[in-house]
A protein has these predicted regions:
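The alpha-helix within a helix-turn-helix
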Residues: 51
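C-terminal regulatory/oligomerization modules of transcriptional regulators
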Residues: 119-139
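Residues within helix-turn-helix
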Residues: 47-48, 59, 66, 86
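Pre-recognition alpha-helix immediately N-terminal to the DNA-recognition helix
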Residues: 16, 35-38, 96
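N-terminal leader segment of winged-helix/HTH proteins
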Residues: 1-28
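Charged, amphipathic alpha-helical coiled-coil/dimerization segments
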Residues: 66-126
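Short capping segments at the starts of secondary-structure elements
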Residues: 42-46
Length: 139
């Protein structure tokens, strides 16, 4: 039941974010690329760690990173202590996506605030924060 209840809001969120990024000039980005962007640390992240965080195979994550690298959103370099691993970092172009992404998220939140009354939206956000905190502690 939880999956069914979350499916439509998640799909709507991803669709709206994708449309916003296209409108901001990032038509080459797709929702699947969020698996990379959402899981990158500011100092860079190993592909294996990105894959673990996104709960996907290293090969699938490697393909996403390779595509984003070809487009200039990320760069990868050998890990300083493990030559077998690569560290992925946002490039200047990749960092430029952060502001429009945040603006799009704010726009979605504003739109959803119009679909729920004020108390419902506050409760929705409160419960999401609580769930996020609890799940973060479990990791």
């Amino acid at each position: 039941m939880l999956g069914v209840l979350l499916r439509q809001p998640l799909r709507a969120l991803l669709d709206e974010l994708n449309a916003g990024m296209v409108a901001a000039g990032y038509a080459d980005l797709r929702p699947a690329h969020s698996a990379v962007f959402m899981n990158l640390d500011t100092e860079g992240t190993r592909i294996t760690d990105l894959a673990d965080r996104a709960q996907m195979t290293k090969q699938s994550m490697g393909a996403l990173v390779s595509y984003l690298e070809q487009l200039g959103y990320v760069s990868s370099a050998p890990h300083p202590h493990d030559g077998r691993a690569k560290v992925v970092r946002l490039t200047k172009k990749g960092k430029a996506t952060e502001a429009p992404a945040r603006q799009n998220i704010s726009r979605v939140q504003e739109r959803w605030s119009q679909l729920l009354d004020k108390d419902e939206m506050e409760e929705f956000l409160r419960l999401l924060r609580k769930l996020n905190d609890v799940l973060q502690d479990d990791r």
